[in-house]
Regions:
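Active-site pocket-lining/capping segments in soluble small-molecule metabolic enzymes
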Residues: 1-101, 110-197
């Protein structure tokens, strides 16, 4: 639900009315289907943990059915402490691009681990995964395979999300575009960039 400052992976613009959020949660959960929030912004600071919009989403959906995907240890710790009913998924944004790193992550307290998608077609490595039943494969990535800047892309997208949310606080009726990014937030050249902002 935009504008979630905790969002990562792809910049989400727009806004959602709190009543709409509540209706979506009740409708989807009413069918026994969990929602999984993609709170994977790697650039979060402690000041972002108290974000009213994101905490409201977490409170509205705090019923033991829903899930959250995380990359930030800071946010993960905050969610585990304040919203212990949520199942937590480890994000592909962590760039766990070896089987050893993936297996280590699977030993931690995660419901699922989303694999780095550079592993998706490396079948000889996939056979070495210890807990395949707790792995998830991402099939709609924004980056090209083996993108050398993927970690930086995630950071830049996280900064864009923060900039967007801060912009909305100052100018709630203003239109946010690439042209009015705050100073210090740079866009990068990437064939997939248009699909992220």
């Amino acid at each position: 639900f935009p504008p979630s400052i905790w969002n990562g992976g792809r910049t989400q613009v727009g806004t959602c009315d709190p009543k709409f959020i509540e209706t979506v949660i009740k409708t989807i959960n009413g069918k026994g289907i969990p929602l999984r929030f993609t709170f994977t912004n790697p650039m979060l600071e402690e000041k972002h943990l108290e974000d009213k919009f994101c905490n409201n989403i977490m409170r509205l959906a705090d019923n033991g059915l829903n899930e959250v995907i995380v990359v930030s240890p800071l946010l993960e710790e905050y969610i585990r402490k304040n919203y212990p009913k949520y199942k937590i998924t480890s994000s592909t944004c962590k760039r766990l691009d070896s089987v050893d790193a993936l297996n280590d992550e699977l030993e931690k307290d995660y419901n699922l681990v989303v694999m780095d998608y550079d592993l998706n077609n490396r079948f000889e490595l996939l056979e070495q995964i210890k807990h395949k039943d707790r792995c998830e494969i991402l099939v709609n990535s924004c980056c090209q395979p083996k993108c050398k800047r993927r970690s930086q892309h995630y950071k830049d997208i996280g900064l864009q999300q923060i900039a967007y949310c801060e912009y909305l606080e100052k100018y709630p009726d203003g239109r946010f575009t690439k042209e009015n990014l705050p100073e210090g937030i740079e866009l990068f050249e990437c064939p997939s960039m248009d699909s992220t902002l």
